[in-house]
Amino acid sequence: MKTNSDLYQVTTHAPGPAGQLPLDADFLRNAPSGDVFGLTQDAGMGWPAGQLRRKEFLILSTLGGLRAPDGRPIALGYHVGHWEVGLLAQAAAEEFARQGAIPFAGFVTDPCDGRTQGTPGMMDSLAYRNDAAIVLRRLIRSLPTRRGVLGVATCDKGLPAMMMALAAQRTLPCVVVPGGVTLLPTQGEDAGKIQSVGARFAHGLISLEEASEWGCRACASPGGG
């Protein structure tokens, strides 16, 4: 077996971001240590050090999958509903930054009960709502410097979870952004009816060709239910 000596040249240090954190004596002396270290983290992720300590806003979404900038799927999500909500979150983040604020983003993806239908995964669909709402609330509290929260979510699991999480924020301004809907196919069946193709084929109500074609085009665009 051949070895490459470069494998053993492990990088352990780097120069780090240039600049200085916008600290003052009062902040450094009295702020929670997490607020100070948070600035170090922010600079480490590439935000210009001189622009830190501005108003911070948290964007939460149910984004799933990995979508290339040209729309090509790198890794699929659980359903088309959360496939492009990242674009909405990105637009919101860019607007926050344009207004002089600092956007943060966090994600709690959601399942699809259509995908789990007829499997043990159905046991997790409704339970997901409460579980995800708890996680979303924990993410909100885990950014202590946030001034408000914007939630982007779709479908009948992710959107209720987001709404429950934001409704619990009694001292923060919050906005819910529905992620849009899936367009209907010009010809064929919608994403609800198409889920019964197996049963209808078994009863001779549709042909194999119809099931194959309609099933391919039923989700005519990304979007949620």
Over which residues does each language-model region extend?
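Metallocofactor- and cofactor-centric catalytic cores in central/energy metabolism, strongly enriched
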Residues: 1-225
